[in-house]
Structures are given as C-alpha cells and as structure tokens.
C-alpha cells in the first residue's frame, strides 16, 4: 500500500509517522523548504485541556484524550512539554455561568485537574491579574510544547 500525506507540519509528520508503522510506502509532500514552516511555525503551542468542546462532538471526545497522550508522545519524540495550566477568567455572575458550562463540558470530556477558582485563589495563582476578575476556570493539564520541534522529531 502507498500512502501520501500532504503537509509537513506537526499533524502531517505525525500522521506519516503513524502510517510508517504499517507495511507500505509513505510519501510526505511539503511545499516549503523545511518541515514545520507553515501553520505549525505560527501555532500557539498550546496543548488544550479539552474543556471548551461539547462532549457530543468528535473534538470534545478526542481533545482531552489527546492531551493525556501528549506526554508519552513527547517522551518518544524527545520534545519539551510544560504543563503550565490555563485559566479562563470571569468578572461577574453572568461570566461565572459560562465557567460552570465549561467545567461541565470538561468533566464530561474526562479533563483532568479542572476546577473553578474563587477570587482569592485566582489572585494567589496569578498575582498580577487585574482586580476586576473574581473567578477562573483552572485547567492544570493544559500545557505548551514546541510545535516545529514536534514536526521535525516526528519525521526522523
């Protein structure tokens, strides 16, 4: 079997890597001079927690699971991952309701280390944050990586 993957960014190289584990030829086509030079280079580098997507959606089902798998992938590829966490802030009760919705989504999606912080805990976690913020959804499993390094490492 012959497989052709178009795009040598993080996603394309990871797909090609996975396909190469099976019998057959894998061809990776990239239009730029090097891997990871397109969208991957401009990527925010965030490893999303998985709380934003509705549980019934495909992305909702896969985002939290992908987050869990990322540490193993990073070890395999020898690329950095920092679990720095993320926060979504709210000023008032109306915005707080949105945090509660995100919490319910995240729990249904299986997101680890997800909770709502009150004002005091939020300002201890982020001392420089504006005093107008009273609540936050904290996701400790969110992290960052180096997407272009993922693309290069996955291609080796």
Say what each PLM segment does.
Residues 19-21, 41-44, 61, 102-104, ...:
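Short, glycine/charged-enriched secondary-structure capping and boundary segments
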